[in-house]
Amino acid sequence: MNSLKLYLSTLRYLRLRQLLYLVKQRLLPAPRIKIDRAQAVQLRQGVLLSPSLVPDPSGCEDYEFSFLNVKRSFAAKRINWVCADMPKLWRYNLHYFDYLNDRSRSSDSLAEIVSDWIDTNAVGVEDAWEPYTVSLRIVNWIKWFLDDSFDTIPRQEWLRSLCLQAAWLEKNIEHHLLANHYLKNAKALFFAGAYFAGSDAERWFRKGLKILCEEACEQILADGGHNERSPMYHCIVVEDFLDILNLCLNNSGLVEPREIAMLRERTSAALDFLHDILAPDGQIPLFLSLI
């Protein structure tokens, strides 16, 4: 009875669209994704990105990963992508591929890690194929592909996998969760649509941009704070919008000036809010919520 009351109490705060998508997700079979693996993937020409915000080098070895203060090492081409003995959030981080920006690692080892992920993680595998995880991985792969400092030319197998991930994400947007997850989904579709060429890519781009513009107005409140009122989520969303502006401003004509102006204004407000809440040592307040 207590579980039922808790469940109903949670549902009462959801929007109708969230409830509908939640029911759809639970009752309907997963949508099938069709990609012609024999056809070469086409890229939009001349796409550029300025260097993104990157963490300090981790100091990890090429096949060593450290998340949540827990470090694991693997042999080359023998990464355990399941890691059942590790916490779920640790496993998620393994699949995010944030470490592609780690200057401690060699380009060759990163290339092997990407190929190993593709060979090991079929569509639908738990942890690897969840919308939030896929969203972060799409953006991280594209950033890496466009980063001249790694001197890595994307292989067709990588591009086909990236295209498949974007097609899968389009069918699995987190309408039932919204908030920062929804924004991550939109950002990934926007990046994939800007990176690839063709009708699918154009649809991803338009869909992602539409959601981003809507969510910039909804999630960044009048005072510049994020609507979840969490300093951590606020920082994550600020970085998302900085990445989005990076892509917009480095690729003339990609996005309409009025949309860029709106995104800049909302991002500027969010940066001002972040500046105002920082502690004297420059760290964010360690609260789950500011409310």
What does each model-found stretch correspond to?
Residues 26, 30, 251, 277-281:
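Phosphate/oxyanion-binding loops and surfaces in catalytic or ligand/nucleic-acid-binding neighborhoods
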Residues 1-2, 82, 267-268:
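Short hydrophobic/aromatic segments of transmembrane alpha-helices and their interfaces
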Residues 1-79:
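Extreme N-terminal leader/anchor segments
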